[in-house]
Amino acid sequence: MSRIVVLGAGESGAGAAVLAKVKGFDTFVSDMSAIKSKYKEMLDRYDISWEEGQHTEELILNAEEVVKSPGIPNDAPIILKLKKQGTPVISEIEFAGRYTNAKMICITGSNGKTTTTSLIYHIFKSAGLNVGLAGNIGKSLALQVATDQHDYYVIELSSFQLDNMYKF
């Protein structure tokens, strides 16, 4: 069984962890901050190991791949160590994209992302399409892919979410 480590346990990280677990990965989540109770409950429900308030290197550096939440800088010490040893570090969006055949409409840019994303989602939903809303608004893409597959996803992507995307 492959080992996936998820760094950050907010909406993005918790969703990525659930998807990893559902797909059969040995999954571990680490967050330097306190994890909100709703995400702890989600991780516990899926029997996912987690830690908060630290990044225990021996539990992280043995990952075959790491899913990094967008709030963690690429120059964080643990990220630099992972990259130095050659461990792939990817985004939640990149990870989730591997497990869906849905069509994805992604919106990025400086201004108007949320409005544009919401408008497109509303148009699709009003047309009766099976559509999910993800990214900076709505549930994480990974959580939706794990729990309620859609035919379409409308995704708002910040510049931070574009980091660590390679094949999406």
Question: Residue spans of the language-model regions?
Answer:
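N-terminal leader/targeting and accessory segments in enzymes
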Residues: 1-91, 95
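Phosphate-binding loop of NTP-binding sites
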Residues: 58-61, 70-168
